[in-house]
């Protein structure tokens, strides 16, 4: 059972998307702790500096320095972060991107802009998982 509030990290270079997800999580999963990162390059160093791993990472695929695919690959190869759930986020609806993300270990895939209904369903499932863990 989750004894503290969920920790969600949003890795996206688009501040509008960061804001959308931050607001959605705060409305749907209160209380929640949000951490915003602007690029995949920042993720592993930020994880190394915390003792409280996130319960979920929302990861954009299209970022300027280190894209989401490479970030996800690094994450899945770096203990103890291999098992942190990751939902990838992209403007691309290409099946190849979804398949590649799944092969690299993504737990879910959202196309931008995600509908609020889809966010409700996804976040509701995550809250149930958090409450059971």
Regions found by a protein language model. Give the residues of each.
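C-terminal output helix
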Residues: 114-125
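Conserved acidic segment of CheY-like receiver
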Residues: 5-25, 57
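His-Asp phosphorelay/catalytic-motif detector in bacterial-type signaling
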Residues: 5, 52-56, 80-85
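Acidic, metal-coordinating helix/loop segments flanking the phosphotransfer/catalytic sites
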Residues: 36-56, 120
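Receiver (REC) domain active-site loop signature in two-component systems and cognate sites
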Residues: 63
């Amino acid at each position: 059972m989750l004894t503290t509030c969920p920790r969600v990290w949003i890795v996206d270079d688009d501040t509008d998307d960061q804001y959308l997800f931050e607001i959605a999580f705060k409305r749907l999963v209160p209380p929640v702790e949000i951490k915003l990162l602007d690029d995949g390059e920042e993720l592993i160093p930020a994880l190394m500096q915390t003792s409280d791993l996130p319960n979920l990472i929302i990861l954009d695929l299209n970022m300027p320095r280190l894209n989401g695919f490479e970030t996800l690959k690094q994450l899945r190869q770096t203990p103890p972060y291999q098992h942190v759930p990751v939902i990838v986020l992209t403007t691309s609806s290409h099946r190849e991107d979804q398949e590649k993300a799944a092969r690299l270990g993504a737990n879910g895939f959202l196309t931008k802009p995600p509908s609020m209904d889809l966010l409700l369903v996804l976040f509701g499932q995550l809250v149930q998982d958090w409450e059971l863990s």
